[in-house]
Amino acid sequence: MNNNELIEKINKLRKEKNAIILAHYYQRPEIQDIADFIGDSLELSRIAQKSDADIIVFCGVRFMAETAKILNPTKKVLHPNPESGCPMADMATLEGVKKLKQEHPDAVVVSYINTNADVKTVSDVIVTSRNAVKVVKSLDAKKIIFVPDQFLGSYIARQVPEKEFILWKGFCPPHFNLSKETLLELKQRYPEAKIAVHPECNTDTVEIADFVGSTTQIIEYATTCDADTVIIGTEVGILHALKKKNPNKNYVFPQSADYCGTVHCCDMKKNTLDKVLEVLEKETNEIILPSEIIQKAVIPLERMLAVA
């Protein structure tokens, strides 16, 4: 089947089954185009919580689909490709976080939403890159265990210097591989350009940026700032949204040191139209979580949503 035929079948099935399709900005363009909602982790968490659909098809990596299930335990959440995982989320382990809690009993565990469900169960609050600083500032605790992204944690620590941070040594491989030198070379080629990066980038890269923010915040900044050219330091999938919002600007994506070339999350690209159709037809690849995990993991998620 060609894409038009796939899309026609997808649209028919989602109407028949009262299903919605959620897609992260890093998904393939054709996946973003069929989605009912496109967003970053925070936006999609809110939409998932408020949805009245019977079925949620989540086009993202696994922890995102798990989050949708945790917030909607009675709904059927389908993940088009179960091989679409997050290497950074897998870097944080349940036993490792428990050990840190024992070593620092006066600390609060703040987990990035990019964690697996079991780690969320031992977290005090969840954050996204968009609301992390606000949530951490709202906490009474003076000591923070931040899991799993050391670079986002370091960025938050610089914004909230009154708190002590214990950082898990995790990272996002595509963002980590984007070097300061690469951005500076692009700046020489485009001297009038602004640089916008994600806080998952390493500290040296973040420090030379004109703007640091979440995926949605980068899209807002890049499409509305006064520069005609913006160097984008995050996953190349957001180019689709950038062009839709403001096609008159020049968006430059740097080459990364990883094997994918640009800042490119190979896992995010594993969800395809044929896989979306397959899970809608067969209702396979359902996210199943034990009720105990859901009951524990929803607490820090709801704390986040209440604050931000």
Curated annotation (Swiss-Prot):
Enzyme class: transferase
Cofactor: [4Fe-4S] cluster
Pathway annotation from the record: Cofactor biosynthesis; NAD(+) biosynthesis; quinolinate from iminoaspartate: step 1/1
Cofactor, how bound (note): Binds 1 [4Fe-4S] cluster per subunit.
GO cellular component, one term: cytosol
Keyword terms: 4Fe-4S, Cytoplasm, Iron, Iron-sulfur, Metal-binding, Pyridine nucleotide biosynthesis, Transferase
Molecular function, one GO term: quinolinate synthetase A activity
UniProt signal peptide: none
InterPro entries membership: NadA, NadA_sf, Quinolinate_synth_type2
Residue positions binding [4Fe-4S] cluster: C86, C172, C265
Localization in the cell: Cytoplasm
Binding site for iminosuccinate: H24, S41, Y112, I113, N114, S129, H198, P199, E200, T215
NCBIfam families in UniProt: nadA, PRK09375.1-2
Family to which this protein belongs: Belongs to the quinolinate synthase family. Type 2 subfamily.
Primary role: Catalyzes the condensation of iminoaspartate with dihydroxyacetone phosphate to form quinolinate.
Name of the molecule in the record: Quinolinate synthase
Lineage of producing organism: Bacteria, Pseudomonadati, Aquificota, Aquificia, Aquificales
Gene that produces this protein: nadA
